From Swiss-Prot:
It is found in: Nucleus. Keywords: Metal-binding, mRNA processing, mRNA splicing, Nucleus, Spliceosome, Zinc, Zinc-finger. Belongs to the SLU7 family. One of its GO terms (biological process) is mRNA cis splicing, via spliceosome. Pfam families: Slu7. The keyword tRNA processing does not apply. This is Pre-mRNA-splicing factor slu7. It comes from Schizosaccharomyces pombe (strain 972 / ATCC 24843).
């Protein structure tokens, strides 16, 4: 053969010689296996293919539609007859809620619910209001039995959270929101109409020269002749405090009475606010000195410490004042001594007063006698 004579051959020559050999010898092993597979009849043509994934072999229950064209029918597993119509879903059937089985019984039956008297459930599953004395003992107001359905569904349908949901119920929610939107739009239209009417009325009033009380508004711009409070010539001693946005005098503590619309207004201080500020200052000073006092974390302890400190300061101040008074006096004794001396100088003795009065009386009698003598001599 040619391939044996030539040691080095091209790929084309080698493949041609190989095909020649195969035609001479017969069909290859692969072709023989394929012919045998074709000639053997399939035992079960509807057998499940284990290599097809489940999400392809079984369509979900919510995606099934009788009218739609099945595009993956060649990969679906054969439908099995199930009580729910050969589907894994419960389409068209679900638990009936609140349906009763005919009229209620007239007397209590053995094995029924002790609370309401129905045979469809026990006491622990009863949804009726708990009675003081149940139907078992009273035999009154026995409820009818509920309809209990046994629906066989697949594993996925049992665990599907949307199973049994009716999408038509959401239409009620949409209708409710649409009504709210309509009412809101109507309110906005009415408000716009009222605003337009008010604007027109104000324009008409300004044109005609008559001003209505409703159309009078405060001017948003300052008048040209208006002067700011801190630029006035008569307020030389006033100072503007930007923190409180007010005008203050030189002391800075008293507010200035301003008649120009409350330029010197400030929030009222004192009362509990002042007490809290004192307590906060005490806490800060105590923390600096090493005492741990926290007003926010423990306000009761802080208040007690503040009161103790206040009482101790008052007692120490009293001791200091008393020691100063004992050493130097309060000055009232000297004033009393001066007043007493002045009174002694001003008020004379009673004996001196008697002597002076007697001497005055004697002098008066002597003068009268002299006058009488002179008169008699003249006569």
């Amino acid at each position: 053969m040619s391939y044996m004579n030539n040691t080095f051959q091209s790929n084309y020559d080698y493949s041609k010689d190989k095909n020649f050999m195969s035609t001479d010898i017969g069909p290859s092993m692969r072709e023989m296996k394929a012919q045998k597979r074709r000639s053997r009849p399939m035992d079960n043509p509807d057998a499940d293919n284990p290599y097809i994934p489940k999400f392809i072999s079984t369509a979900p229950w919510y995606a099934q539609d009788d009218d739609a064209v099945e595009r993956l029918a060649h990969q679906r597993i054969g439908k099995k007859e199930t009580p729910s119509g050969g589907r894994s879903s419960i389409e068209g059937s679900w638990y009936v809620r609140g349906k009763k089985l005919g009229p209620a019984a007239t007397k209590y039956r053995k094995g029924a619910c002790e609370n309401c008297g129905a045979m469809s459930h026990k006491v622990k599953d009863c949804m009726e209001r708990p009675r003081k004395r149940g139907a078992r003992w009273t035999g009154e107001d026995i409820q009818a039995d509920e309809v209990i359905q046994d629906i066989n569904v697949s594993w996925d349908a049992k665990r599907d959270r949307w199973n049994g949901y009716d999408a038509t119920d959401y239409k009620k929610v949409i209708e409710r929101y649409e009504k709210l939107d309509e009412l809101q739009n109507k309110g906005e239209e009415n408000r716009d109409a009222s605003e337009n009417s008010a604007v027109k009325a104000s324009r008409n009033s300004t044109v005609s020269g008559s001003e209505d009380s409703a159309s009078i508004t405060t001017p948003s711009l300052r008048m040209r002749e208006d002067v700011v409070a801190y630029l006035r010539a008569d307020n030389k001693n006033l100072q503007y405090e930007p923190k409180s946005r007010s005008m203050r005098d030189e002391t800075g503590y008293h507010m200035v009475d301003d008649s120009s619309g409350g330029a010197g207004f400030v929030k009222a201080s004192g009362g509990e606010k002042e007490d809290f500020e004192k307590l906060q200052m005490f806490a800060w000073e105590a923390e600096r000195s090493g005492t741990r006092v926290h007003v926010v974390a423990n306000p009761t302890a802080g208040e007690l410490e503040f009161r103790k400190n206040k009482a101790s300061r008052m007692t120490t101040q009293k001791h200091i004042d008393q020691s100063i008074l004992d050493r130097y006096g309060d000055g009232t004794s000297k004033v009393k001594d001066k007043k007493a001396k002045n009174n002694e100088k001003e008020v004379p003795d009673l004996a001196i007063l008697d002597k002076s009065e007697k001497s005055k009386g004697e002098s008066n009698t002597d003068e009268e006698s002299e006058n009488l003598v002179i008169v008699e001599g003249d006569l």
